[in-house]
């Protein structure tokens, strides 16, 4: 028959093997920075190319604050010096 020492050694071996095979819960504070970096660079690259395409397509224009051009310059247009001349000629 087996001695109590052999049985104890067998139990210790079985317990150590059982604890080694037990699935470990993933640590919630361990992050995969490589995948996060690759994903971020991919999204940044796509947004960069999309921005360049929008700029080069000339379809995205400022719709507000545009006036129809009639060919005559507006009174507000021109240099600062010409606007001073207009104001001084009105006072006389």
From Swiss-Prot:
One of its GO terms (molecular function) is sodium channel regulator activity. Disulfide bonds: none annotated. The modification Phosphoserine is found at residues 82-83, 88. It comes from the Eukaryota. One of its GO terms (cellular component) is T-tubule. The keyword Hydrolase does not apply. The chain crosses the membrane at residues 36-56. It is found in: Cell membrane, Sarcolemma; Apical cell membrane; Membrane, Caveola; Cell membrane, Sarcolemma, T-tubule. Residues 83-92 have a biased composition (Basic residues). Major plasma membrane substrate for cAMP-dependent protein kinase (PKA) and protein kinase C (PKC) in several different tissues. Phosphorylated in response to insulin and adrenergic stimulation. Phosphorylation at Ser-88 stimulates sodium/potassium-transporting ATPase activity while the unphosphorylated form inhibits sodium/potassium-transporting ATPase activity. Phosphorylation increases tetramerization, decreases binding to ATP1A1 and reduces inhibition of ATP1A1 activity. Phosphorylation at Ser-83 leads to greatly reduced interaction with ATP1A1, ATP1A2 and ATP1A3. The keyword Signal applies. Residues 57-92 are cytoplasmic. Keywords: Cell membrane, Glutathionylation, Ion transport, Lipoprotein, Membrane, Palmitate, Phosphoprotein, Potassium, Potassium transport, Signal, Sodium, Sodium transport, Sodium/potassium transport, Transmembrane, Transmembrane helix, Transport. Disruption phenotype: Adults exhibit increased cardiac mass, larger cardiomyocytes, higher ejection fractions (the amount of blood pumped out of the ventricles with each contraction) and reduced sodium/potassium-transporting ATPase (NKA) activity in a mixed strain background of C57BL/6 and 129/SvJ. Decreased cardiac contractile function and increased NKA activity in a congenic C57BL/6 background. Increased glutathionylation of the NKA beta subunit ATP1B1. Decreased excitability of neurons which secrete gonadotropin-releasing hormone and delayed female puberty. Residues 21-35 are extracellular. GO terms for biological process: negative regulation of protein glutathionylation; positive regulation of sodium ion export across plasma membrane; potassium ion transport; regulation of cardiac muscle cell membrane potential; regulation of sodium ion transmembrane transport; sodium ion transport. Residues 1-20 form the signal peptide. Residues 66-92 are annotated as: Disordered. Homotetramer. Monomer. Regulatory subunit of the sodium/potassium-transporting ATPase (NKA) which is composed of a catalytic alpha subunit, a non-catalytic beta subunit and an additional regulatory subunit. The monomeric form associates with NKA while the oligomeric form does not. Interacts with the catalytic alpha-1 subunit ATP1A1. Also interacts with the catalytic alpha-2 and alpha-3 subunits ATP1A2 and ATP1A3. Very little interaction with the catalytic alpha subunits ATP1A1, ATP1A2 or ATP1A3 when phosphorylated at Ser-83. Interacts with the non-catalytic beta-1 subunit ATP1B1. Associates with and regulates the activity of the sodium/potassium-transporting ATPase (NKA) which transports Na(+) out of the cell and K(+) into the cell. Inhibits NKA activity in its unphosphorylated state and stimulates activity when phosphorylated. Reduces glutathionylation of the NKA beta-1 subunit ATP1B1, thus reversing glutathionylation-mediated inhibition of ATP1B1. Contributes to female sexual development by maintaining the excitability of neurons which secrete gonadotropin-releasing hormone. The cytoplasmic domain is sufficient to regulate sodium/potassium-transporting ATPase activity. PANTHER family: PHOSPHOLEMMAN (PTHR14132:SF12), SODIUM/POTASSIUM-TRANSPORTING ATPASE SUBUNIT GAMMA (PTHR14132). Belongs to the FXYD family. This is Phospholemman. It comes from Mus musculus (Mouse).
